[in-house]
């Protein structure tokens, strides 16, 4: 391609993504756009085409981002190349969104005509504005009986401050308004500005592992041109590779000779090691490197930690491989080996949030067929010791001795909750129960309110989201951001079975609710742990002080069954003998703890 052809082609490229709250119809809209641009034959078309993971289709959410190249013949007779980068909408996957937005020039904002704007819509819009994207509002699901497009249009203007006078009214399901959306993309989204002659700069916004071709990086070319056979360098790791293939997704992978400015596609270079391609890294030429890497990507820190252990301990190495493969295109997942007396060898994993944790767990169980035990999730605490030292604790069993602790700080988040008027009381009650501090309350319109609270992250980790949804009949939407650490009265609670501490059941709790929590968990474990041949005491302890206790009664055989009437001393002898046996058993016996017992530690808030 010569210089003029490249420039002409570049002016016809439009890179955009679709942002929306969960269930506002983003994946369906993506399907319609693919259909309209004839990217697929009718036979290949299936609902939620870009949600390629089974788990995504089942839960009806988008987890991984996907990129696809489309050609569209606009009304002005010209052919345009559209790159659609699909994004997730759930709060845990904001980082997936920030990655795909960094690769675009425009974003379609989908808002449900019945529901209006929700918390995560706002969060994603602010991300898009941070990346200086052109935002095109689309009001979707106008064919619903409860749709009120005019109210929603007003809401977009009032709450977000976007001009919604030209917002497209659409129904992705019925295929209404799709052409107008495509025309607006062509008209309003700017073409990529980059120079194909400059040193190469490509941003990696995702990657996946192919056992035959090695790591395949999903890239957006910002400056320069990359061809097969080029020697390229990863700017974060400094590793160099030779490009073996480049191409685009139409949604199938299609090989090309080169990728140039504005292209969104893939690059393979026989990269064998997962750690060599970091998502968010910049690829440049080895011989003529760019002066600096591209901005627009931040390292994500996990917020929630838990232990993952294989039920069959022989599969420890398989679990390591599974985690490494998942980490490849999920840069926010972190893990390190750990051991537990109760569970053997496993990994301490860091996640962005609870949904992220559940999904990684399910993917390991499905894709790698490994049965897992998970321990209670915890957050990172900062512990200041009396000798002035500061230590970071992400695992309750690493908590130092209470006597040596000066103070403990825990992470707090700022939670914005959007909720209909009728449920404000219920939401406030939940937040106060979770040690939340009320900050602000704003009315969006006559029917909806945004509440802002500061809440300890450890309280959100358990079941805040479930409680919020069930107490507001599913109407509340919720978004949170970390704001820093604050001092709290926290203590570590240990659970003792038969006098022995089970390290995997330890958790960190606020002193005020320690007694209640200990009581609930001891009762719950009593139901879940099967009866043994001997009596098993279950105790909850803080340091050396026992705060709650319950006992699992022993199973016993009726040793008197063969005595008919007769002598009491004979009966007494048999009972004494049984008692002696139980005593001996108790001193050597160990108690098996079922998986449900570990989960009980998580779910104990339900009964309170």
Swiss-Prot record:
Residues annotated to bind GTP: 23-28, 140-143
InterPro entries linked: EF-4 (IPR006297), EFG_III/V (IPR035647), EFG_V-like (IPR000640), EFTu-like_2 (IPR004161), G_TR_CS (IPR031157), LepA_C_sf (IPR038363), LepA_CTD (IPR013842), LepA_IV (IPR035654)
Main location: membrane
Catalytic reaction list: GTP + H2O = GDP + phosphate + H(+)
PROSITE patterns in the record: G_TR_1 (PS00301), G_TR_2 (PS51722)
Enzyme class of the recorded protein, top EC level: hydrolase
Gene Ontology molecular function: any one: GTP binding
GO biological process: positive regulation of translation
Keywords recorded for this protein, A-Z: Cell membrane, GTP-binding, Hydrolase, Membrane, Nucleotide-binding, Protein biosynthesis
Domain of life: Bacteria
GO cellular component: plasma membrane
EC code: 3.6.5.n1
Subcellular location field: Cell membrane
Membrane topology: Peripheral membrane protein
Residue ranges crossing the lipid bilayer per the database entry: none
PANTHER family, per database record: TRANSLATION FACTOR GUF1 HOMOLOG, CHLOROPLASTIC, TRANSLATION FACTOR GUF1-RELATED
Record family assignment: Belongs to the TRAFAC class translation factor GTPase superfamily. Classic translation factor GTPase family. LepA subfamily.
Protein name (Swiss-Prot/TrEMBL): Elongation factor 4
Protein source organism: Bacillus cytotoxicus (strain DSM 22905 / CIP 110041 / 391-98 / NVH 391-98)
Gene: lepA
């Amino acid at each position: 391609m010569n210089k003029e052809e490249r420039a002409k082609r570049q002016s016809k490229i439009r890179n955009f993504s679709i942002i929306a709250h969960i269930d506002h119809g983003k994946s369906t809209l993506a399907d319609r756009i693919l259909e309209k641009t004839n990217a697929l034959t009718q036979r290949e078309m299936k609902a939620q085409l870009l949600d390629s993971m089974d788990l995504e289709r089942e839960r009806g959410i988008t987890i991984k981002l996907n990129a696809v190249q489309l050609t569209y013949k606009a009304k002005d007779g010209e052919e345009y190349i559209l790159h659609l980068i699909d994004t997730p909408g759930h709060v845990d996957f904001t980082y997936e969104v920030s990655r795909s937005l960094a690769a675009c020039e425009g974003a379609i904002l989908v808002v449900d005509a019945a529901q209006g704007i929700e918390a995560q819509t706002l969060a994603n819009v602010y991300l898009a504005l941070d990346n200086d994207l052109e935002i095109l509002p689309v009001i979707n699901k106008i064919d619903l009986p409860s749709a009120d497009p005019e109210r929603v249009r007003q809401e977009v203007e009032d709450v977000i401050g976007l001009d919604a006078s030209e917002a497209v009214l659409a129904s992705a399901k019925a295929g209404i308004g799709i052409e107008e959306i495509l025309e607006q993309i062509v008209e309003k989204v700017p073409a990529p500005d980059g120079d194909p002659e400059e040193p190469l700069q490509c941003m990696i916004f995702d990657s996946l592992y192919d056992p035959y071709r090695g790591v395949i990086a999903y890239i957006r070319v910002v400056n320069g041109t990359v061809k097969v056979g080029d020697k390229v360098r990863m700017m974060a790791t400094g590793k160099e590779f030779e490009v073996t293939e480049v191409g685009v997704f139409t949604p199938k992978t299609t090989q090309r000779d080169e990728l140039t400015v504005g292209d969104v596609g893939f690059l393979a270079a026989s990269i064998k090691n997962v750690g060599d391609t970091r998502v968010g890294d910049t690829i440049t030429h080895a011989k003529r490197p760019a002066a600096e890497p591209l901005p627009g990507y931040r390292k994500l820190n996990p917020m929630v930690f838990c232990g993952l252990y294989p039920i069959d301990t022989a599969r420890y190495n398989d679990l390591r491989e599974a985690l490494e493969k998942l980490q490849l295109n999920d840069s926010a997942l972190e893990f390190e080996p750990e051991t537990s007396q109760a569970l053997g060898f496993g990994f301490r994993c860091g996640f962005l949030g609870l949904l992220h944790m559940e999904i990684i767990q399910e993917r390991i169980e499905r894709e790698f067929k490994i049965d897992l035990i998970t321990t209670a999730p915890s957050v990172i605490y900062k512990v200041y010791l009396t000798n002035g030292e500061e230590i970071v604790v992400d695992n309750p069993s690493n908590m130092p001795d209470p006597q040596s602790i000066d103070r403990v700080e825990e992470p707090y988040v700022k939670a914005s909750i959007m909720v209909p008027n009728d449920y404000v009381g219920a939401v406030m009650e939940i937040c106060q129960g979770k040690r939340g501090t009320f900050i602000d309350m704003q009315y969006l319109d006559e029917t909806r309110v945004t509440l802002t609270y500061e809440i300890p992250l450890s309280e959100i980790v358990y079941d805040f989201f479930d409680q919020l949804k069930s107490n507001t009949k599913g109407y509340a939407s919720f978004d949170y951001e970390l704001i820093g650490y604050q001092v709290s009265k926290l203590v570590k609670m240990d659970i003792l079975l038969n006098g022995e501490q089970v390290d995997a059941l330890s958790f960190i709790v606020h002193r005020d609710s320690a007694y209640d929590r200990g009581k609930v968990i001891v009762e719950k474990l009593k139901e879940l742990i099967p009866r043994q041949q001997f009596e098993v005491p279950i105790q909850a302890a803080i340091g050396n002080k026992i705060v709650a206790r319950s006992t699992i009664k022993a199973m016993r055989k009726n040793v008197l069954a063969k005595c008919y009437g007769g002598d009491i001393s004979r009966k007494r002898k048999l009972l004494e003998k049984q008692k002696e046996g139980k005593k001996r058993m108790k001193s050597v016996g160990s108690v098996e703890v079922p998986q449900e017992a570990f989960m009980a530690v998580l779910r104990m808030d339900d009964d309170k």
